[in-house]
C-alpha cells in the first residue's frame, strides 16, 4: 500500500459477521497481538489460509501454525471440525475458547494429550484419538461437556487413516 509493506494483520475492530475465511499472503508475519492472534475480532471465521512460501506461518485444514511446524498459532473461532497436524504432545490450551467446535481429530503421530489441552469448547461432541496416543490425561478436557465421546481409531472418513 503506497510503498509500505504490510507484515502484520492486527484488527482494531471486529470483522463483519459474513467473513468466513481469511487468506494471508507471503508478506504477513504476525496476526493480532502477541499470544492472542485475532482474539475476539474474527468470531465468524471458519477457516484461515496462508500462501505457500510464507516462511513464518503456514496453514493446514484451515488452521494456522508457526512456520512449517506443528505449533498451533491460530484456530478460527467458528471452526466446527478441527484436524490437528501430527504433534508429539498436545499441551495445555492448544485448543481453547472455540464455542462452535464439535469435533477434534488428533492425527497419527501424536503420543500425549496433556491436562487442559482442550478448554472452553461448549459444543464439543467427539474427539478422534489415533492408536499412537499412549497418554490422554483425565483432565485433558476442561470446561467442555461431560458427555464428549473419545473415539480411539478410525475417524469414519475414508481419506483419514488413524
Residue spans of the language-model regions?
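Short acidic-glycine loop/turn motifs at beta-strand connectors
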Residues: 66-69
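Structural signature of tandem-repeat unit edges
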Residues: 1-32, 40-62, 73-89, 98-112, ...
Amino acid at each position: 500500500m503506497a510503498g509500505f509493506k504490510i507484515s502484520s494483520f492486527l484488527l482494531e475492530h471486529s470483522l463483519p459477521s459474513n467473513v468466513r475465511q481469511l487468506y494471508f499472503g507471503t508478506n504477513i508475519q504476525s496476526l493480532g497481538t502477541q499470544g492472542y492472534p485475532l482474539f475476539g475480532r474474527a468470531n465468524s471465521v471458519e477457516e484461515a489460509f496462508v500462501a505457500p512460501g510464507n516462511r513464518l506461518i503456514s496453514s493446514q485444514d484451515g488452521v494456522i501454525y508457526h512456520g512449517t511446524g506443528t505449533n498451533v498459532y491460530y484456530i478460527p473461532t467458528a471452526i466446527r471440525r478441527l484436524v490437528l497436524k501430527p504433534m508429539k504432545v498436545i499441551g495445555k490450551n492448544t485448543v481453547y475458547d472455540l464455542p462452535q467446535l464439535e469435533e477434534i481429530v488428533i492425527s497419527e503421530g501424536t503420543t500425549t494429550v496433556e491436562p487442559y489441552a482442550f478448554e472452553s469448547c461448549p459444543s464439543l461432541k467427539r474427539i478422534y484419538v489415533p492408536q499412537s496416543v499412549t497418554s490422554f490425561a483425565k483432565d485433558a478436557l476442561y470446561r467442555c461437556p461431560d458427555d464428549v465421546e473419545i473415539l480411539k481409531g478410525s475417524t469414519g472418513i475414508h481419506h483419514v487413516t488413524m
